């Protein structure tokens, strides 16, 4: 008997991806706050958990739904960047995110794509230098009038009237299993995706749909919003439909009505500003504008209740007192409970344990979690970046604008927003206890920028791994920056000017003249309004500081093992010197975030300093496109009885001079779509060198890979994909159909060269089978007849007859359990004698009947099938293989424990030939 002992280990990774085409870093951050749930899901895309941002990946796997290559992982992910004032515990607890599905969140810029009122005009996007000033004379074609229309488009659907125009691309953040990025849309339906990829988002209105590179469809049919549904909303994944249309995974939610205020999600927001108003007489007035303290913005976020597929389902059960606090996950297969996960929490806010139970309701294993106390609640005191910096604000009506001291002895009576390391770490995860009862502890420290200045947010400092007896097994500690200086690149230093928006108030009044009343310019007031948070983005990839160099040390104090040095690509954003009026811009001219955080190099040395492994990557930009935007800001406000002069202010010298030719301030910026990919990779491992060079197509797929070994010999692999054939394909051809169904991932042609000599070639031919497109033939060099031929499929897209070159027999299959499992295989014969009625009945049934299986078994003695070999498969209610019957009638049985794990394998006499034990501690 063979015994196997298996141990489950929690994945804690220091991730450092190599290929640029998998990047999901956004080109530009969102300006509008999405719902808390969307923020929690999206941040694992825009704030990647790698050492470039000082983070490690902490994931608790719960369950994975797998259907025809589609994987829906259900997991708890922890983001160890620190807790902000507007973070919410949501389903799992502070810092944790339930990942089970996906979201598409929309934020309007300038005019929304979903305005139902007003009169839409063509987009107005010009270079600032080309916008004509002082042409507001009543002409319908003046540039300054077009800016009026742009500002009008930025209103909500409830207040907009008259003509409007767009000037910026709206943004959709999308995140679903194995895919994330941004999709941009302009009012004229011009669109693009960041990064350029084979994933396509379309129908991006009130029911967005995405297709992945295999042609699988993801539908997002349930929505939440903050009430202004035309400018800010999130859609949630409701269906995944396989490319062959044979399988659908359903996501069910409890939708929340706006009247159910106790069920809404209330996100903390800070709105109040502090203004200085300087008039012509040299008098300065100051005022607080807006509601002080921390207020709330409400979202009607739906609650995930169930994920189901063909009799299998995952149920999510919540607290009866806290509707969004997840208490239990129950996993069923074919109606049978196979396992459950129960959560223990403190105050519904901190996850203390995740306990896994089998079908017999007995605990199998668990994870435990400990934290650095609790973060302050309510009217908390915060630093410049939104992290906690003290026990509480001095008053529930405190002014959260920083207490800056400004030129001319001006002061703002706001809060002290400086960083406090101790309070920033409150509520952070510090320990995970594994099912083995071993555990890992985590130590964090604040980010450090140039010159050692501390910045908001946390980075990993140290991880210690202990066994169940509390003995240290391994230690990892991290040194950041060039030469381990501890310093990275701060995105922006704190500057009061970044918090300030400026405007100009102009009084217009009537005065008697020789020919009647005339319009005169009266009082002029300059306004500086200071906000609680900077208008310019202080984050890149979600972090206040990024690190181009990080060194990881490993070992124990008694036995150091060496170190690993990581080097990442790092580019600063490119900023304008100012707006049209010379003020600070909110958005950089070009954001280079999409090129940052790529693994440039990795060097591993042992404890003697000897290099045992090294990797060096060279990158290049591909498929780059820059899209111009025009951001327009209100600046001059003409008020008073003669305010109508603003419609023709250019005809009045005083007003045209005072406004400097425009009522607005504006600037350009670009959104970049492209990819930053590995061009060449050099690797040294165990004394062996190799170099790999890559070339890509317009969708970022590798079309050529050249491997050069230590001796200088080259092997070249060239691939062609759907888009490479589609360019020259006729309309209606298989390549045309695959292209428009977004089936891009299959390599249709693979050629292998040794030097210049072709040594191997494989061609994969696809066919439109009516309801779906699937593989028909596999051909190889010198065999222009098919080497593998797929002759037929069932209605679920499963192959039913396959033949291979060199084998003088076909292999036929019957699928059961609604196309989820093979129940019979025949070699050298066919199942035609069963007839289509029985075959279809068996395939469609939730479980084949005993009578139908007996008919299939009887084929073993059918004289017409003499010489053929039949194998049958039997499954339990959870679709685990229960019995295998070989062509000679030999039976092998499989038994499982209450958690659905394989426990033992028995021969036909009941003798155990293999057993499995799982290394958990109770």
Language model features with spans:
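Low-complexity, serine/threonine/proline-enriched polar segments
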Residues: 277, 381-405, 488-522, 610-612, ...
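Long, intrinsically disordered, low-complexity, charged/polar and glycine-rich segments
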Residues: 21-238, 242-245, 285-298, 376-422, ...
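Long, internal scaffold/assembly segments composed of regular secondary structure
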Residues: 323, 329, 333-368
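Amphipathic hydrophobic-ligand
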Residues: 335-342, 363, 472-474, 611-613, ...
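Edge/loop elements at the starts and ends of beta-strands within beta-rich repeat scaffolds
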Residues: 232-233, 300, 322-324, 347-349, ...
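Solenoidal tandem-repeat scaffolds enriched in leucines and small polar residues
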Residues: 250-328, 610-664
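Bacterial Sec-dependent N-terminal signal peptides
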Residues: 1-24
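Beta-strand elements of repeat-based all-beta scaffolds
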Residues: 207-211, 238-241, 304-308, 327-330, ...
């Amino acid at each position: 008997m063979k015994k196997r002992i298996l141990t489950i280990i929690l994945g804690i990774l220091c991730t450092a991806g190599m290929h640029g085409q998998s990047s999901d870093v956004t080109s530009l951050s969102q300006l509008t706050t999405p719902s808390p749930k969307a923020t929690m899901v999206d941040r694992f895309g825009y704030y990647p958990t790698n050492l470039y941002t000082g983070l490690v990946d902490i994931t608790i796997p719960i369950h994975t739904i797998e259907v025809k290559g589609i994987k829906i992982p259900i997991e708890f992910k922890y983001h160890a960047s620190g807790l902000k004032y507007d973070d919410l515990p949501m389903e799992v607890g502070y810092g944790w995110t339930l990942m089970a599905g996906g979201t598409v969140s929309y934020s309007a810029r300038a005019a929304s794509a979903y305005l139902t009122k007003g009169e839409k005009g063509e987009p107005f996007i010009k270079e600032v230098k080309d916008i004509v000033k002082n042409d507001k004379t009543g002409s319908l074609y003046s540039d300054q009038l077009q800016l009026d229309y742009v500002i009008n488009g930025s209103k909500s659907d409830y207040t907009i009237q008259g003509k409007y125009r767009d000037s910026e691309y709206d943004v959709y953040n999308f995140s679903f299993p194995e895919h994330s990025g941004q999709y941009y849309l302009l009012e004229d339906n011009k669109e693009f995706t960041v990064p350029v990829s084979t994933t396509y988002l379309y129908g991006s209105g009130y029911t967005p749909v995405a297709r992945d590179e295999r042609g699988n469809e993801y539908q997002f049919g349930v929505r939440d919003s903050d009430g202004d549904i035309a400018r800010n909303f999130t859609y949630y994944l409701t269906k995944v439909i396989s490319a062959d249309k044979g399988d659908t995974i359903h996501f069910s939610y409890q939708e929340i009505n706006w009247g159910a205020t106790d069920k809404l999600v209330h996100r903390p927001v800070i709105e109040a500003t502090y203004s200085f108003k300087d008039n012509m007489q040299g008098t300065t007035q100051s005022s607080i504008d807006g509601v002080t303290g921390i207020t709330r913005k409400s979202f009607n976020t739906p609650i995930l209740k169930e994920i189901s597929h063909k009799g299998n389902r995952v149920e999510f059960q919540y607290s009866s007192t806290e509707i969004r606090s997840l208490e239990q996950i129950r996993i069923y297969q074919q109606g049978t409970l196979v396992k459950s996960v129960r959560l223990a929490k403190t105050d519904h806010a901190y996850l203390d344990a995740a306990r896994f139970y089998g079908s017999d309701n007995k605990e199998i294993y668990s994870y435990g979690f400990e934290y650095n106390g609790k973060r302050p609640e309510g009217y908390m005191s915060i630093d410049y970046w939104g992290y906690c910096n003290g026990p509480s604000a001095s008053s529930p009506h405190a002014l959260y604008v920083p207490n800056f001291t400004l030129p001319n002895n001006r002061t703002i009576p706001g809060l002290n927003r400086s960083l406090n390391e101790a309070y920033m770490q409150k509520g952070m995860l510090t320990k995970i206890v594994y099912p083995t009862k071993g555990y890992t502890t985590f130590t964090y420290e604040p980010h450090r920028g140039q010159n050692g200045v501390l910045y908001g947010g946390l980075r990993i400092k140290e991880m210690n791994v202990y066994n169940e007896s509390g003995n240290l097994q391994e230690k990892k500690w991290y040194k950041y920056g060039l030469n381990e200086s501890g310093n990275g690149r701060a995105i922006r230093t704190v500057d009061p000017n970044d918090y300030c928006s400026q405007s100009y108030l102009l009084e217009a009044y009537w005065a008697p003249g020789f020919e009647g009343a005339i319009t005169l310019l009266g009082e002029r007031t300059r306004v500086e309004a200071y906000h609680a948070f900077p208008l310019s983005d202080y984050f890149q990839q979600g972090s206040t500081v990024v690190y181009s160099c990080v060194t990881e040390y490993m070992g124990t104090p008694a036995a150091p093992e060496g170190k690993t040095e990581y080097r990442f690509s790092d580019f600063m954003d490119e900023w304008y010197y100012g707006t049209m009026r010379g003020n600070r811009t909110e958005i950089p001219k070009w954001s280079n975030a999409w090129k940052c955080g790529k693994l440039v190099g990795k060097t591993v040395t042992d404890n003697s300093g000897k290099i045992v492994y090294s990797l060096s990557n060279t990158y290049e930009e591909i498929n780059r496109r820059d899209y111009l935007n025009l951001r327009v800001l209100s600046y001059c406000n003409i008020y008073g009885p003669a305010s109508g002069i603003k419609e023709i202010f250019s005809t009045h010298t005083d007003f045209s001079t005072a406004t400097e030719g425009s009522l607005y301030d504006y600037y350009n910026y670009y959104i970049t779509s492209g990819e930053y990919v590995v061009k060449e990779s050099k690797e040294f491992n165990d004394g062996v060198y190799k170099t790999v060079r890559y070339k890509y197509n317009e969708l970022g797929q590798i079309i050529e890979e050249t491997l050069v070994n230590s001796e200088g010999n080259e092997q070249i692999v060239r691939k062609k994909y759907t888009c490479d054939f589609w360019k020259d394909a006729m309309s209606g051809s298989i390549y045309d159909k695959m292209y428009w169904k977004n089936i891009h991932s299959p390599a249709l042609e693979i050629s292998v060269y040794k030097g210049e000599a072709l040594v191997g070639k494989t061609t994969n031919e696809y066919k439109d089978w009516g309801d779906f497109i699937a593989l028909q033939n596999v051909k190889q060099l010198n065999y222009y007849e098919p080497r593998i031929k797929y002759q037929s499929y069932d209605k679920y897209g499963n192959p039913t007859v396959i033949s291979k070159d060199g084998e003088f027999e076909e292999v036929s299959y019957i699928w059961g359990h609604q196309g989820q499992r093979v129940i019979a295989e025949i070699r050298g014969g066919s199942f035609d004698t069963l007839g289509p009625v029985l075959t279809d009945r068996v395939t469609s049934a939730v479980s084949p009947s005993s009578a139908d299986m007996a008919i299939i078994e009887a084929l073993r003695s059918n004289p017409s099938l003499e010489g053929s070999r039949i194998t049958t498969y039997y499954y339990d209610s959870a679709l685990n293989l229960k019995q295998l019957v070989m062509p000679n009638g030999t039976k092998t049985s499989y038994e499982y424990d209450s958690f659905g794990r394989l426990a033992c394998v028995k021969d036909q006499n009941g003798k155990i030939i293999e057993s499995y034990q799982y290394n958990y501690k109770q």
